[in-house]
């Protein structure tokens, strides 16, 4: 992709998000070292959701901060070059979805349909929190010299980043 084409780049962004089964998470920890983890992710009506347990240190850090950095990344087995795996990194604020809401039930059903029967087991566990990610912006990397700035909640492709 040589030209800056926001429409084509948006299609690639949407493909990366649609194929993602998990999202990597990083948040500041208590001792200023980042806490990192990974959790399944689903999309519903254009929004991204995670359902992690607060028993994990990275989830406690995320809940305390109310925001975190996230990344979806191309599967290693599909990458043309391991040094240039396609990835989408973004910062997001978190919105906790109340357990007694229609949204909670609908998203839990999507988790079960997407990721299998484990959701039926953990759905009622009180240490799990349903979180909607509200992106603020980020970067999409599609290969060498193919990094693009993403802006806003829709992660609009706004700029080709040509230098560090």
Question: Model-flagged regions — what are they?
Answer:
Residues 46-47, 66, 127, 136:
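Beta-strand-connecting loop/turn residues
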Residues 1-63, 71:
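An N-terminal domain-cap segment
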Residues 32-34, 63, 83-85, 123-126:
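Short coil/turn motifs at beta-sheet boundaries
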Residues 2-7, 11, 109-110, 114-164:
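C-terminal edge-of-domain segments
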Residues 53, 73, 143-145:
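Surface loops and adjacent helix of pleckstrin homology
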């Amino acid at each position: 992709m040589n030209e800056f084409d926001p429409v084509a780049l948006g299609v690639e962004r949407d493909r990366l998000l649609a194929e993602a089964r998990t999202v990597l998470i990083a948040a500041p920890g208590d001792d200023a070292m980042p806490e990192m983890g990974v959790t399944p992710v689903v999309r519903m009506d254009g929004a991204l959701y995670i359902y992690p347990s607060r028993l994990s240190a990275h989830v406690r850090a995320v809940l305390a901060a109310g925001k975190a950095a996230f990344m979806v990344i191309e599967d290693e087995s599909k990458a043309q070059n391991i040094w240039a795996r396609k990835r989408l990194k973004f910062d997001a604020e978190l919105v906790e979805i109340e357990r007694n809401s229609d949204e909670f039930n609908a998203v839990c059903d999507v988790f079960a349909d997407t990721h299998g029967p484990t959701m039926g087991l953990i759905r009622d566990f009180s240490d799990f929190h349903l979180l909607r990610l509200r992106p603020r912006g980020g970067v999409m990397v599609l290969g060498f010299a193919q990094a693009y700035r993403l802006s806003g909640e829709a992660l609009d492709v706004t700029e080709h980043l040509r230098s560090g």
